[in-house]
């Protein structure tokens, strides 16, 4: 039985052998916008179809929870790069329902890491980062649920 990696490499080899990517496309997006969205597996292909965008139209940045954490976090840096290197004129931020990030907390992920053998010493080094990143989502989720009642 083939491993997942072998399957992916076989698909890539066939893709390249059949020249399925023959059209040259500029690294500069034709529609001059960037899209920030979640890395959720349900959005693969769906987001492009839902928004009517195609290869070469936009810079697409995906991360867990469509998050923009920190004044100069990696997502902010990426967006700045799109503006000042790739001449992006607009940025669209698209979230989705039932986001896994909104349904978890720093306590949840730290518990899971602990149960997989990550030491308390290592967890202490990253605990604050997870609290800053994940716990505001939980607050927003509860606030949103309360507003719906």
Task: Put a short name on every predicted segment.
Residues 129-141:
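Flexible, glycine/proline-enriched loop segments at strand-loop-helix junctions
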